Amino acid sequence: MTQYARPDADTSVGNWAASSGSSRYAMIDESSADDSDYISVSSMGSAETIVLGLSDVDTPDSGTRTVVVRAYEDSGFNSVQLDVTLKEGSTSKGSQSFSSGFDSVANLSFNITSSISDYSNLNLTISATDPMGMGTAYVYQAYFSVPDAAAEEVTTSPAFLLFVD
């Protein structure tokens, strides 16, 4: 079974806006993609960054660990670059730049190969840059998926018998 670390806190929102309400993380934390709520940022001549805390997951068994961001850019020129970074505290554990392929709603993903020691201290940084300053970047969903937790080792002890007379 898979575990999901989903946004559960707005750590630093910059100029990113929520489609409704004030919590950005609540717009993109759903387990099933919902394109009716989102976060967005417009007219970014320079990088616009949001940092989101992620929910805790148990230390996983070995297997593929993947960051997924469901996004769209509407510049009409495919000019928005989205940089996504998974961090443990302030240390980058993996990042990917996406500069094309999301001029329609798309799931952008990459695998994490670096080791992570504390799965309760993860955050996701998303930066959008449009050198033309004409586009809007939308993010509809974001999460980090990991395998199920490793099975606990069962320890057995030899039987102990006590006879009382």
Label each region the model flagged.
Residues N78-G89:
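Short, surface-exposed beta-strand/strand-loop-strand elements in extracellular ectodomains
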Residues M1-N15, S19-S20, Y143-D165:
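Enriched but not universal
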Residues M132-S145:
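Edge beta-strands of jelly-roll/beta-sandwich modules across compartments, strongly enriched
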Residues S32-I50, F98-F102, G133:
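Extracellular beta-rich ligand/substrate-recognition surface
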Residues S92-S115:
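Extracellular carbohydrate recognition and processing domains
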Residues E48-G76, L124:
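A short beta-strand element within beta-rich, extracytoplasmic domains
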Residues Q3-M44:
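Disordered, acidic Ser/Thr/Pro-rich linker "stalks" and the adjacent N-terminal cap
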Residues T125-G133:
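Short beta-strand-plus-loop segments that form exposed binding edges in beta-rich domains
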